[in-house]
């Protein structure tokens, strides 16, 4: 991986990745959860239960991600690039505390014209390990939940938008120097497993995911949303 390229495209992808980055990821989750509940039209008790289940899936996914990161300890692409071009030893870099890593990134890039200022700040904020991608896991989980929960009710446009958004997040992680392709693949696999379990639990606890008979005619007449 090397920095550089089409800066307007990279900046656009940066804003896509920010929809998942803390603290904006919390707002994204709240909006998506509200939209899911509106689309599914569950009764209040089931809606609250489903909301808790959705957030539990996200929290568990992020916990699994953190556990794997601490075990595998794979350096991010931009850290490898710093090692190759600035002589920053990767093992030394990750032996530092997060604030010290951020300061080191800022110091090494202060005279670097190839890396725009907004990307430097993003690197300073994201100094953890690479494998697997937490951003990908977050976005892929929501996109796959859309397939599992919203597709049966013909919310095709919503599912398509979620897929495009998740793909944008994944592409941004590669092009911004944050992850390798294998990080994205593993994150997507974990997300898929989580979604399978989540949809199974949702059906077991809150009823079938397919619409009840009284909604069938309405859904059949509805334009895809």
Across the structure, where does each feature detected by a protein language model lie?
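Hydrophobic alpha-helical membrane-embedded or membrane-associated segments
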Residues: 22, 53-57, 187, 191, ...
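Membrane-embedded catalytic cores of phosphoryl/pyrophosphoryl-handling enzymes
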Residues: 94, 99-225
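Luminal/periplasmic active-site loops of membrane-embedded glycosylation enzymes
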Residues: 3, 85-102
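Alpha-helical transmembrane segments
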Residues: 23-27, 50-54, 157-164
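Interfacial segments of alpha-helical transmembrane regions
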Residues: 33-74, 80-85, 158
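Juxtamembrane/transmembrane-helix boundary motifs in multi-pass membrane proteins
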Residues: 6-10, 37-49, 53, 122, ...
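Hydrophobic alpha-helical transmembrane segments of multi-pass membrane proteins
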Residues: 16-20, 51, 55, 130
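N-terminal transmembrane-helix/juxtamembrane module of multi-pass inner/ER membrane proteins
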Residues: 1-33, 65-86, 122, 221-224
């Amino acid at each position: 991986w090397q920095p550089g390229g089409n800066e307007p495209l990279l900046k656009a992808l940066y804003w896509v990745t920010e929809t998942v980055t803390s603290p904006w990821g919390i707002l994204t989750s709240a909006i998506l959860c509200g939209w899911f509940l509106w689309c599914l039209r569950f009764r209040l008790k089931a809606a609250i239960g489903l909301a808790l289940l959705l957030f539990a899936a996200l929290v568990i996914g992020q916990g699994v991600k953190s556990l794997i990161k601490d075990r595998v300890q794979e350096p991010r692409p931009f850290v490898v690039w710093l090692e190759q071009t600035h002589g920053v030893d990767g093992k030394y870099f990750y032996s530092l505390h997060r604030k010290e890593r951020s300061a080191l990134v800022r110091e090494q890039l202060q005279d670097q014209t190839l890396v725009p200022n907004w990307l430097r700040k993003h690197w300073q904020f994201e100094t953890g390990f690479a494998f697997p991608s937490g951003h990908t896991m977050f976005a892929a989980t929501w996109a796959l939940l859309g397939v599992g929960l919203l597709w049966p009710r013909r919310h095709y446009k919503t599912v398509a938008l979620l897929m495009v958004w998740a793909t944008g997040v994944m592409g941004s992680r590669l092009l911004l120097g944050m992850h390798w392709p294998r990080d994205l693949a593993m994150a997507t696999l974990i997300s898929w497993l989580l979604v399978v379990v989540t949809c199974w639990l949702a059906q077991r606890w809150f009823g079938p995911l397919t619409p009840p008979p009284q909604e069938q005619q309405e859904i059949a007449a509805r334009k895809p949303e």
